[in-house]
Amino acid sequence: GIYVGSTCDPETKKYTYGGIKLKQWGKRAGTILVPNGTYQQCDLANANILMISRTVYNVLGSFSNEYTHGIADFDYSLSAVKAGFPVWVLPFYCGECQNDHGPSWLPQGSTLKQRIKYLYSPKGLAYKQQLHYIRKFFPSEYNEMKIKLWLKTLFPFIWTYLKK
C-alpha cells in the first residue's frame, strides 16, 4: 500500500497536508483526515511525506509526467486506490510544513493578462493539467471545472462573491 505522513504548520500546529477521503467515488468533494491516533484509509494523498511500497511501485511506476508541480500526488494515490491498493494516513503528524499553495485565483485588481498567465501557470491554476486530472478521475465534473477556471480568471469579483 501507500502510507501518508500528515504535516502541520510549525507555528499553529494545524493540519496542512496529508490525506483526504472522497465522500463519493467519482466526485471531487472529500473530507480531510486529520491524524487521530489510528490509521485512516484515504483516496487522495499529498506527497510531502509519502511511502510507496515496492508492490505498488512495480504496478504503477513513478508519478505521471503529465504534471509539473502539483496534482501528480493525487493522480498517483487515486490510481493506487483504483488498482486495489490501500492508501493509509498515519495515526500521527510526521512533520511540519507551512501550506505553500498560492491563492486559487487572482483578484479583480490584477490585469487580465496576469490572470490568464496565472490560469495556465503550473504554480497557478495549472489549467491543462487540472483538466487532464479531472477528465481522468472525475469526468462528470469536467465541464463544470472548465467553467470555474475561466470564471475565476475572467470574472474574479463573481468568484470572490460566491466564495463568501
Residue map of PLM features:
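Short, hinge-like loop/turn segments at secondary-structure boundaries
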Residues: G19-Q24, W105-Q108
